[in-house]
Amino acid sequence: MTILICLAGATGWAGSALARGIAQTDDIAIVAAVSRTHARRILGDVLAEPGLTCPLYTSAQEALAHPCDVFVEFTKPEVARSNVLAALGQGAHVVIGTSGLTDADYAEIATAAEDHQRGVLAVGNFALTVVLLQKFAEIAARYIPQWEIIDYAHADKMDAPSGTARELAFRLSKIRPSELSVPLEQIQGEVETRGARLTGSQVHSIRLPGYTISAEIIFGLPDQKLTLRHDSGSSAQPYVDGALLAIRKVNTFVGLRRGLDNVLDLT
């Protein structure tokens, strides 16, 4: 049975790569897509991919006039929440690849998913190495009480911290908050230089030319430290593989789940 999807952000870096990946599958089809830049054109014409014959629309609300099984969100954080809620209202399951959504946004989305009895899979980063980084960090946090998170990205990335860093901090908050030897209120000097306190973790965001996407977490004990790091290359292929898996699995549960590991067997 073919999974019909609506793809928001279809001509962006990740969305266009996913669209091309979908064109190579025989069990997923794009019935409508969103691209404000190329609205009213055919997706395949824009991407030079003849097999993609769906129309492009300005908004998710327009695109959702086409019935779909799964709505895939790859736009911007300022519109992602409303797009997801609209898709749930139309009875679609949702895969979220957009970073920058807050815990408050996710709380609202979780409620809507339960109300509509649909699955939502939110993945800050679809790469397998990120999934493993998160798992290894959760193990380390049980034994090492102090850590800090650093995310690196190109100079033009608007959201901070990255979805990967935000998701990592959220996951570790379920284990315990990172201890601070010197409480923030006792810092002498500019406290902002210690980073942001996000769900119990100190998080630092670096935005400079020369970076693509990297995430790092450093755990510290007396006379020893542990560093876990993920680095992305310029190809979107790791994200495509993860997103295809998410599309195929998001209808297997009800409610919000955060992280690709929720549909992987990592036991």
Question: Where would I find each of the regions flagged by the language model?
Answer:
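Rossmann-like NAD(P)H-binding beta-loop-alpha module
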Residues: L132-I144, A160
